[in-house]
Amino acid sequence: MQNMKRMKANQAHKWPVPERIESLYRTMADALGPTGWWPAETTFEIMVGAVLTQNTAWSNVDRSLAALKAEDALEPHALAAMEPERLQELIRPSGFYVNKSKTVQSLSRWYVERCGAAPEGAAAISDAELRAELLGLFGIGGETADDLMLYVFSRRTFVADTYARRLFAFLGFDVPAGYPAFHKAYSPVVLSTSLSVRDLQEFHGLIDEFGKAYRDDAAKSESFLGVSLTQNGAQ
């Protein structure tokens, strides 16, 4: 019954079905190979990077992370206790450093107090509750919360970012406006696939790498997806 309702909803709104998502993942994985996402030495580095990458290039994030490492400060207890002015100085290359410093410290304190500074500390928290808690922290929006869910806490989720929006729109599917609506519409479909956490991590990386390489519809049409996927339409 649930599958029938989902199929009818997909047809009405022209959303992809789970099999289409899996086919897309396999095609992209075969063409682009392992992406290695998320690039980091520790899960906490992923957490901080997910905040710093908001509205900036990754090269700027790398500079900020390098500065934190040079201070031996890329550790949750250290960042939770650091003087805000010092943290702002270290992450200045990432831009919006005042607000980002508040977010980094809010997230660090939550991670220490709620999770014991380890991903395993959140094991007893349900997916819905964990996402709600992350969204309740200063400066954490939907995309950042889903990045953390997927890459830090190893929860199956769909990162409905700009690159995903552009890709599915190019493939002829309806894409609801705004991150919350897009995530809400596509998450049930993505989570109905057989893709594992690791697959979904890689899928997000593949989507973003594809989006960076093929920035507009003309370029996408000439890519490996242009012929093989657009011929299938919204199956």
Where do the language-model regions lie?
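Catalytic cores of DNA base-excision repair glycosylases
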Residues: 10-234
